Amino acid sequence: MTENHYLLLTPGPLTTTKTVKEVMLYDWCTWDVEYNMMVQQVRAKLVSLATKEEERYITVLMQGSGTFSVEAVIGSVIPKNGKMLVCTNGAYGKRIVQMAEMLHIDVVVSQTEEWEPTNIVEVEKILQQDKEITHIAVVHCETTTGIINPIVDVCKLGKQYGKVTLVDAMSSFGGIEIDIAELQIDFLISSANKCIQGVPGFGFVIAKRDELLKCKGQARSLSLDLYDKWETMENQNGKWRFTSPTHVVHAFYQALLELEKEGGVKARYNRYDNNQKLLVNRMREIGFKPLVDEKYQSPIITSFIYPEEWFDFEQLYNELKRDGFVIYPGKISKVDTFRIGNIGDVHEADIHRLVDSIAKGVVIG
């Protein structure tokens, strides 16, 4: 198998290892006992990554993009008379609001600017004033900008006021240490193609068992019924309720083994964090400033402000692609930015090569 044709410096899909790609060269049967045993191992490994209190939590795997898993949670967990508070400061928080509205779920929003973290004071004020709220949702790493939201404080407040807590950890789980029991998270959602460094094809939900059991019969969708998905996997020893992405599951299992070999989530966080800090330092040297304040910046993806009015992102994108790199355009409305991801099979030497390539095509100041 040939090496990558270019390096993805994006927040997922991302650059995977050759060994992760190689396991997808074979075909697998969804009914095969060995395959279903692998599914069960994946589920168990995810819980062990999420908490030391493994007996209290379970994993549900869900076909589709991470958004499918988020919508499965929103549509299955919140009862008809429920009401959700959503903390938003980017596109993915707004998407949760949109899901709730489409599903006719009563929703209230705590919104901050895209470069500012969730406002805990405002969240508490809303919880104090609106006694009808039953659930609270927050995005951990909002990849619209790369900002980290204070999930410790949000979940603590949620439990202080007796709410069910939902955390979209799509772009952080596996790359930032999280103990969902300590943080009092009831439902955590992530995806195969993010920090665990698998490929796109399924998402997953790590849920507190007691809370999941309350969801039976509540789903607003047949194929996105979180409880029924879990019940099928649980009762049929790893069998998915509908056709599973077998190649993607094998790639994900391999990626989990490689995460363990790297030294676990802490070691991976250190690599990502080093990538991010090196990237910012090198980009500052050639005239680019990050959007997000350092104290709120994640190690996942970094937004850089356009340096001058004449700056042409499309030209930079095409030049970088010719040099073997792919980066992301900006996603916020008030400031012109572009984004560079720090995750995947990306290392210090790659960051140096990238910035050297940017410096060739851009002269600032």
Curated annotation (Swiss-Prot):
Belongs to the class-V pyridoxal-phosphate-dependent aminotransferase family. PhnW subfamily. Its cofactor is pyridoxal 5'-phosphate. One of its GO terms (biological process) is organic phosphonate catabolic process. One of its GO terms (molecular function) is 2-aminoethylphosphonate-pyruvate transaminase activity. Homodimer. It comes from Bacillus cereus (strain AH187). This is 2-aminoethylphosphonate--pyruvate transaminase. Gene3D superfamilies: Aspartate Aminotransferase, domain 1, Type I PLP-dependent aspartate aminotransferase-like (Major domain). Involved in phosphonate degradation. The gene is phnW. Pfam families: Aminotran_5. InterPro entries: Aminotrans_V_dom (IPR000192), NH2EtPonate_pyrv_transaminase (IPR012703), PyrdxlP-dep_Trfase (IPR015424), PyrdxlP-dep_Trfase_major (IPR015421), PyrdxlP-dep_Trfase_small (IPR015422), SP_NH2Trfase/AEP_transaminase (IPR024169). Transmembrane segments: none annotated. Its EC number is 2.6.1.37. It comes from the Bacteria.
